[in-house]
Amino acid sequence: MSYAQQMIQSNPSPARGGDALATCIEACFDCAQACTACADACLGEQDPKALARCIRLNLDCADLCDVTGRIVSRQTALEPRMVHAALQACATACKLCGDECEQHGQHGMEHCRVCAEACRRCEQACNALIGQFAA
């Protein structure tokens, strides 16, 4: 059992989303790490200037994934509209970053391929959970 699942189950406030919630929390934090590492790897490439858009999207996506993971981890006095907005923003960031990284991944940048995979997983996890929270 993951730490996210253990924390959800041990929280005295009932959680919305069940397994989808734990999956989303884990996907958000995994994606934040992948995006941060991908931005760093892009900076180490021969022509990092050519990767400016990718680096920017990586950093923005990492920030949104991190904050979304923290927001959806909190169950006490939950504000559904806040959670919904965070999930939407995170899914959008993951889509944009994943699309950009996928292009570079197809040209041999393995770090971008891995990051695109993490972005797709997080985007799917956010979209799977978003229905649990009213807009």
Model-derived segments and spans:
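Amphipathic alpha-helical hairpins
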Residues: 1-135
